[in-house]
Amino acid sequence: KLDSAMTSWVEDSLELARRSNGAFDPTIGRLTRLWNIEGDNPKVPSKQEIKNTLKDTGYTKIHLEKVETQNTDTTKKNVDKDRKDNTDKNGDAAKDTDNNTINSTAQNTADNMVNNEADNTPDNTALNEERLETTDKKINTDESVSSIYIEDQCTLDLGAVGKGIACDVAQNYLKQQKEVSGAVIAVGGSILLYGSKADGTNWNVAVQNPRGKDGEAMGVVSLSGTTNVSTSGDYEKYFMQNGKRYHHILDPSTGYPAESSLISVTVVSDNGLLSDGLSTACFVLGKEKGQKLLETYGAEGIFID
């Protein structure tokens, strides 16, 4: 059973994947681990390794179904029908696999992810350590529930928006603290600006120079009210091989680090998850397509090439 928070995170992630045409994809966790860019001895995987791993990715292999109270057989039939319709729509015949339902481990994983998000190393991210487990047990409860069905060997990994989710969770908490009128919370490359400053002036967020030294800023963004700012770039997590930079932002369509001519994207949005995910998607898409994507969400961005 997935509660409303976890369901919302999955829904928003899949919607972003659809709108970006897969430039953001929450199923490439295995590909990220294959590259192991933050490991001790990263190296470029072989073409065959990347090809084999890509076969197990693809956001269209994730099916989220909200299920009202009904008997198990009816629930299974409805979800199977939804899977078939979705597969036909995308023109990609799904392989014959068991209809696995994510059990309550998914919710525990989500909670752990938020609690441990300060450690943003892929191998230490809770959602990477404790993979979403599946079981043949079907959920039958008196409450409305959500079930996830994952095809083949695909895995769902919300680590790519984990920092943004942490900001959203923090914002919800701050809303309940009447004595807090303003706060700044930074989680890796994502920042929550909450409320207002005590002196009434705007929040000022520095935009780092991707090729500068010691966190040198190349500009400042002035913002008011509650908002989220997330940055994705090629300059903090990367390795060099044969004179070429291999960064951690992978293009789900190729399996290799994205090559869009951009070196940094900063996104401003009222939603933490979206600011985090959009910065990644825009980096992969490039400036022109990235700007169009931001417009569909009413978000703003800074593109550096």
For the regions a language model picked out, list residue spans one by one.
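Mature catalytic core of soluble alpha/beta enzymes
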Residues: 1-305
